[in-house]
Every structure is written in structure tokens, then in C-alpha cells.
Amino acid sequence: MLSIILLLMQLVAADIAVVGPSLDQSFDASGGTAKIPIQWLFTPNTPSQDDFTSLTFSLCSGPNYKIEAFKVIGKLSDIGTTDFEAEVSQSVGANGYYYVQIYAATTDGYTIHYSPRFKLTGMTGSKLPDTLLITAPPTPETRVTTGDLGATIDSKSFDIPYGEQNGKAKFAPMQTQPGTKITATTWSRRYATSAVSFFTSLTATPVQHTTLTPGWSYYISSDYNYAPPAPFPSDNGGWYDPKKRQSFTTRKLNMDKLRKRRQTS
């Protein structure tokens, strides 16, 4: 039992942070293929960069609770790099929203991370992706095995107050699910204020590269408004002649006579 506790205390998640492509970015495959630049960075947590042996990139779609892999689009054995340009054939699937799964293999296990959702257009495949833009990517997964003992790692980094964190990647708490009714009559501050300091000159390298948030424990989706735009009133029968709404007839005024009448009165 003690060995299990010590193992879990030594393991921390957030080994890789995916920073590109960005949310709702669009790529066109009408020329036959779409080139997708994938970017990530290594954080100073376990597993470290030296522990990884390969990275496998898969094109996925679907909601966070039902991930569907469409095709493996690349593999890297050179872990020294932090970017990769994947080519996606237009026949892989239809137009819609996709995301990239990065499977990072280590000597003792693996980690799985996901990019934000992006849009692919010009696709000709019959396999249908998700047409909904879900802002949060699927929850990362980390599994490391030591000897005969395996453990699924659940990071506690999200519980540390944001202002007290440092390092290349920071962790924000999960957004809470909005309620269905508004009951508050006054507002109150949810989190205490924190101090802020500013750089007095340009820095050579970024201090912080990205902010990570855990996957939602609930499902919120959005979609396009597929209703056709309403036609102009003159096109849909709603137009009318203003004269039909007049209760009195219009009259022309002789301004010269009216002016003379005012002068003599």
C-alpha cells in the first residue's frame, strides 16, 4: 500500500501541452490535401521529454465522450522537435470539425493529448465528422507503469490557485455548468484579487506558453443556424402600399398663399 502511495505522489500529469492548431481554425483540402501545422511544448512535469520514444498523430472527430479516429496522419521518432505538419487527404471524411490526437509513447507507458477543434473544408469523403463546434477538447490521459504496477494519473494541478503557479504551462479550473435560472439579486466576487507585475523591457523568451483546462464533465454544443435568411418584405408578401394605410387623403399646400395669409393676419 505504501509503495502505491509513493508512486502516485511522484507522478504528475501535463507532460505535453498542445498549442496548435487553434480553436475554429479552418483548413481547405479542395486541392487534394489539407496541410495542418501541429504545435506542442514539453512541460517540466513527469513524464519528461527524455522519457518519450515516439509521437503518433491521429485525425479524430466526435464529442468528447465518443472519440472516433478517422486516420493516422503521422508519426515522429525525433522527440527533439515541437512541431509537425500533417497532410490530410480530402477523401478521409466529409466537411466538418476535427481534432488531432497526440499519442506519446514512453518507455513505461503513454500519454494522450488532444488539440482544439478545427474545421476542414473541401473534403469529399463519405465518413461524417462532427458538425458541432465544442470549445473544450477531450480530457488528456496519462498512464505510466512501473514494474507490475500501473496507475492512471489524475493531475491535481488544476486545484492550485492560478496566481500561485509558475512554469511554461498553467492550469485553470474547469468551467462550471451554467444554471437554468438566475436567482442572485446582487453580485459577489468569486475569487480574491491577486497582485500583478509588468515587464519593464522585452524578454528574450516567453515565460508562459499556454494555459490548460481540464475537460468538462458535462456536454455543451453549438451549431450553425441552418434556417434560411428571411426574404425582403416585398418578396414574401409582407410588403404593402403605404397609401392603403392612410385614413385621410393627402393635400398639396400652396406655400405662397399660406405665407401671404400669415402676413395679413
Curated annotation (Swiss-Prot):
Localization terms from the record: Secreted, Cell wall
Keywords, comma-separated and alphabetical: Cell wall, Cell wall biogenesis/degradation, Glycoprotein, Secreted, Signal
Cell cycle recorded as keyword: no
InterPro entries named in the record: Kre9/Knh1, Kre9/Knh1-like_N, Kre9/Knh1_C
Keyword Cell wall biogenesis/degradation assigned: yes
Described function: Involved in cell wall beta(1->6) glucan synthesis.
Similarity field: Belongs to the KRE9/KNH1 family.
Protein name: Cell wall synthesis protein KNH1
